[in-house]
From Swiss-Prot:
Source species of the chain: Priestia megaterium
Keywords: DNA-binding, Sporulation
Family: Belongs to the alpha/beta-type SASP family.
Site annotation Cleavage: residues: E22, I23
Keyword DNA-binding tagged: yes
Gene Ontology biological process: DNA topological change; sporulation resulting in formation of a cellular spore
DNA-binding listed as a keyword: yes
Name this protein carries in UniProt: Small, acid-soluble spore protein C3
GO MF annotation list: double-stranded DNA binding
Signal peptide: none
Pfam families: SASP
InterPro entries per the UniProt record, alphabetical: SASP_alpha/beta-type, SASP_alpha/beta-type_CS, SASP_DNA-binding, SASP_sf_alpha/beta
Length: 65
């Protein structure tokens, strides 16, 4: 199945890659094709969780003007 996720902000891919490796390092996971899907998935899940928290904090802060 083709990947249809499009990044809307130019340059964000580099940021996300760096974020991914930082979180993997925190978890003690070495990312790569030889790593278990469960380990790689835990990193992806944590990225999503943190990005959602940051977005919620940003939105709640911007609406309290």
């Amino acid at each position: 199945m083709a990947r249809t996720n499009k990044l809307l902000t130019p340059g964000v891919e580099q940021f996300l890659d760096q974020y991914k490796y930082e979180i993997a390092q925190e978890f003690g996971v070495t990312l790569g094709s030889d790593t278990a899907a469960r380990s790689n998935g835990s990193v992806g899940g944590e990225i999503t969780k943190r990005l959602v928290q940051q977005a919620q904090a940003h939105l709640s802060g911007s609406t309290q003007k």
